[in-house]
Amino acid sequence: MSKKIIYQALPRLWGRGKFSDWDEASLRYLQTLGVDYVWYTGVPRHATGKPFVKGNPGSPYAITDWRDVNPYLAEDPARRLAEFDELLARTHAAGFKVLIDYIPNHVAPDYQGPICRFDWCDGDWTDTCKNDWSAAGTRAEMLDILRFWASRGVDGFRCDMVELVPADALQALIAAVKADFPDLIFVAEVYQKDNYRRYLDEVGFDLLYDKSGLYDTLRAVCCSGATARSITWNWQWLADLQPRVLNFLENHDEQRLGSPEFLGDARRGLAPLACSLLLNTAQFMLYFGQEVGEDGIEGADGRTSIFNWSDPPELRELYASLHGGPALAPDEAALLERYRAMLSLAKRPAFAEGGTWDLVYCNGDMPRFDPDRHFAFVRYTEQEAWLVACNFSDRPAALRIRLPRELRDRCPRLPEIASAYVKPWDARLLRIR
């Protein structure tokens, strides 16, 4: 699998909050980022305007009707499914595939349909009721839901909290729907690392979040003083699973890089970005506005709210800049260009399909290389090789990085020592062959 880029977006917070706001200009913008899949979050109809609902309009994960879409997303609510079909057609015509959410664990308390459910919820998800997967009606309906959306042209599903659902049921569902729609992809939200291989090899998911792996590792390096060596330990643990995990630095559940609760400045996210995007052949997910520094400041916890109407300024400015409005602010434009450059590089064969050589093990004795705050690796094919040097510190680093003989034997014409000047919390990408 070549490296795929997934772009997650909540249509309710883009433009005027309508399906139609994902127009040709918006989709052309995604083309400049090298996106392959657009994950439209919050499409199936969820509960709103009820006492149990969290926020206004409410959570996209409290579904009240699995065969409908949210009326507020349509220009004409009476045509809302037709307008979603038109969004699918526009997105496909622009060269992208479409993901939507599949939420097998729960529904909203006011759900009416064949899914059997209990009168209790998991944790603090008080706007939901737990699904009863022991009921044949639940299993049949959850399969029919997948077929309903796949038949409309949806290309895959991001599957919510799958560890809370019987694995054998999910395995049967995936096998059954793929018999009819073999090109569908299923992306699993899995948190227990010991379950990774099971959900990929046995249950049948195509990709799964590496939240508890690389995301948590990079966050600890950035925020808790953890050693950068732990990045090595994570990919070593993943081993052959690396191409089938989905790396990310932001999504709707996590705090924004630029939020005070994370890095405080989105520009400090370039070092972790280089590792998450470029270290291996894992797939990568980008959360809308991340590339221009959206900081979640309009919320109370550093997240862009999935519960309430909001007007994130960076998203507003990005949309306006694509539709004849003012250009992005210089700092936003500069960050966007850095993202574009790295995303473009990620599509080159050396990064999309090539080998990785982690250089930390052979540079611990180099006087300018601090293996706790610096991380370096080479990505290579027979035709080219790139050095990526990351600086997780507040001080600039003038690094001299040793390239071991084993690597040079595999990649002729590489230097024995490479030099890289890396700004604080930044990454340097150098073609060395």
Residue ranges of model-derived segments:
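Loop/helix patches that line or flank the sugar-binding groove of alpha-linked glycan CAZymes
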Residues: 2, 48, 251, 256-406
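Short, well-ordered coil/turn segments that N-cap beta-strands
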Residues: 3, 34-36, 94-96, 153-155, ...
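Substrate-binding/active-site clefts of carbohydrate-active enzymes
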Residues: 3-37, 41-152, 173-181, 195-197
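Hydrophobic faces of well-ordered beta-strands that scaffold small-molecule active sites
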Residues: 5-7, 38-40, 98-100, 157, ...
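Conserved, mostly hydrophobic/aromatic
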Residues: 9, 30, 40, 66, ...
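Active-site beta-loop-alpha junctions enriched in small/polar residues
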Residues: 12, 43, 103-107, 162-164, ...
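Active-site-proximal helices and loops of the catalytic beta/alpha 8
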Residues: 88, 144-147, 160-245, 262-266, ...
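C-terminal beta-strand-rich structural cap/linker in extracellular carbohydrate-active enzymes
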Residues: 417-433
